[in-house]
Amino acid sequence: MAQRSQQASPPPNLAADKAAALRLTPVSRETESRLDAYVALLLQWQAKTNLISPATLPQLWTRHIADSLQLLTVAPDARTWLDFGSGGGFPGVVLACAMAELGGSVTLVERNAKKAAFLREALRVSGGVGQVILADIGDSVDRFPPHIDCITARAVAPLHQLIGFAEPLLHRGGKALFLKGQDVEAELTEAAKYWRLQPRLHASLTGGQGWIVELDRIERQSATTINGTRA
């Protein structure tokens, strides 16, 4: 028991990092409590399952949670969310914790069975509102809610591939918010080979070289291929 307690202990400076994160992206006490429960579970699982990079644990709140919460500043009215490749729960579980208070929900798509099990447990323990779909993104479109306000993805796939997954859903309305890093311009240039789009870029509130790519209107370029498929 003592060994398990030691493994689950947060990094020494996590409290300070949490305070910094909540200054960037304030939440209610209720949502904060849900996030605390999620973080505690993540730290327990992290000891035996690599959910996030160990190097980022000291900045878990600013690097991961605030990075996820900032999507709510770009789409404050969104209530039905779809998260591609949810992995360790960023941004999907974080948004689900916020949606519990706002009357919304999040559908989390994850192809790894162990990570999908973690996501289900994270929703249960935290009280976040959502569902987990164990599937590849491209194979699960018929299982998504009929209307999506906002599609998200973080560290899942190149931008042009994400757009391919999102395109049939965006035609029903809504928008996509993809979290990208310092190579965002190169990814946009590559995506423009396959798609006509008018992206809006939002600098990350967490600093560094992160960006949010906002998309709502996209069209396929003619006579191009995406992953070998004729557009």
From Swiss-Prot:
Name the UniProt record assigns to this protein: Ribosomal RNA small subunit methyltransferase G
Transferase is among the record's keywords: yes
The organism's place on the tree of life at top rank: Bacteria
Cellular component GO terms, alphabetical: cytosol
Chain positions recorded as S-adenosyl-L-methionine binding sites: 85, 90, 154
Subcellular locations according to the entry: Cytoplasm
Reactions performed catalytically: guanosine(527) in 16S rRNA + S-adenosyl-L-methionine = N(7)-methylguanosine(527) in 16S rRNA + S-adenosyl-L-homocysteine
UniProt xrefs under InterPro entries: rRNA_ssu_MeTfrase_G (IPR003682), SAM-dependent_MTases_sf (IPR029063)
GO molecular function: rRNA (guanine-N7-)-methyltransferase activity
Gene3D superfamilies per record: Vaccinia Virus protein VP39 (3.40.50.150)
